[in-house]
């Protein structure tokens, strides 16, 4: 693999990275930073990579730079044709996994997994608001949801920030242009126009956090795929959260490679559509409770629970 391909692969996997972090990942030593400078600048000049800030600068993928294999888009089609391997999960097994996950969330009326319900409902009910007090309230909802879902632990830069760091991201999410992504159906999610919106909002979320002042302890504002997708799941319900369990399961089950990009998202949407009667019946059943569950939330529950069970055995 060439140096440029390694850089693109690392940025696709980790979000924003410094030159030193890239060098360490490629060569095992930050001191090799100068060795990748030429390749990095070539990618920047070709507008495949974006440089943000300084001392140290952060690098992230530009729109459309991350591809999973070869996309097969016909000129007269508005859908992405997702290349799926032999899928090793039946709709019956998927329903069982989703039910198991759901039943575990309702045991405790104040359980942490209900933070998704509260967050998604708040954003759903306040769509396109411009009220500053409401935006502040939504940022607080987002912060607590992310904390409940493990995004404020370890080396996360969010650990050193207050909830208001999310306000610029909330403003982006509330823009009218992203209305098609709210609770999007699996069929609509396979359309090129909506996948382009998803790519765009993902990149804008990365840039927003990258533009924030680094924490006082020097922690880089590294917006990972996990963080971006958890934000999108909790606010728009348009994509599963690409955390360790989800990625592990979709790879093992032959759904997709687990990389966060258009083909991977289209693949899980296609899996839903292939079993749409079964999944829609279950979705309507679950939606009789506090919130209407979007299709991608069901897929998140399914594959997370699958890997969670495997991890315990």
Where are these regions (language model features)?
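Positively charged, polyanion-binding regions of nucleic-acid-associated proteins
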Residues: 1-14
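Helix-hairpin-helix
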Residues: 213-233
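DNA major-groove recognition helix of helix-turn-helix
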Residues: 40, 232, 236
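Short, locally clustered residues in the helix-turn-helix/winged-helix DNA-binding domain
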Residues: 9-12, 27, 233
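Charged low-complexity interaction tracts in eukaryotic proteins
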Residues: 2, 31-70
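An N-terminal alpha-helical hairpin/helix-loop-helix interaction module that forms a charged
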Residues: 71-219, 237-313
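Flexible coil/turn residues that form the inter-helical turn or adjacent wing/linker of helix-turn-helix
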Residues: 15, 29, 239
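Short acidic, hydrophobic short linear motifs in intrinsically disordered regions
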Residues: 17-26
């Amino acid at each position: 693999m060439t140096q440029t391909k390694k850089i693109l692969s690392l940025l696709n996997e980790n979000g924003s990275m410094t030159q030193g972090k890239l060098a360490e990942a490629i060569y095992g030593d930050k001191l090799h930073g100068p060795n990748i400078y030429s390749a990095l600048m070539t990618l920047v000049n070709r507008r495949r990579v974006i440089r943000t800030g300084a001392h140290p600068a952060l690098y992230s993928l530009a729109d459309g730079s991350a591809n999973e294999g070869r996309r097969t888009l016909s000129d007269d089609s508005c859908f992405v044709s997702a290349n799926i391997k032999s899928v090793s999960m039946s709709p019956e097994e998927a329903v069982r996994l989703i039910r198991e996950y759901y039943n575990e969330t309702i045991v405790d009326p104040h359980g942490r997994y209900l933070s998704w319900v509260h967050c998604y409902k708040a954003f759903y009910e306040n769509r396109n608001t411009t009220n500053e007090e409401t935006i502040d309230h939504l940022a607080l909802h987002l912060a607590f949801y992310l904390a409940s879902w493990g995004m404020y632990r370890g080396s996360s830069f969010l650990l050193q920030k207050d909830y208001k760091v999310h306000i610029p991201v909330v403003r982006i999410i509330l823009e009218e242009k992203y209305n098609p992504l709210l609770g999007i159906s699996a069929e609509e999610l396979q359309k090129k126009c909506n996948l382009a919106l998803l790519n765009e909002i993902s990149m804008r979320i990365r840039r927003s956090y990258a533009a924030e002042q680094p924490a006082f302890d020097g922690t880089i504002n590294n917006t990972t795929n996990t963080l971006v997708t958890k934000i999108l799941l909790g606010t728009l319900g348009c994509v599963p959260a690409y955390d360790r369990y989800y990625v592990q399961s979709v790879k093992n089950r032959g759904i997709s490679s687990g990389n966060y990009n258009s083909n991977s998202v289209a693949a899980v949407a296609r899996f839903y559509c292939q079993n749409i009667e079964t999944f829609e019946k279950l979705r309507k059943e679950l939606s009789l409770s506090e919130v209407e569950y979007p299709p991608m939330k069901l897929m998140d529950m399914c594959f997370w629970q699958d890997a969670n069970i495997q991890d315990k055995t």
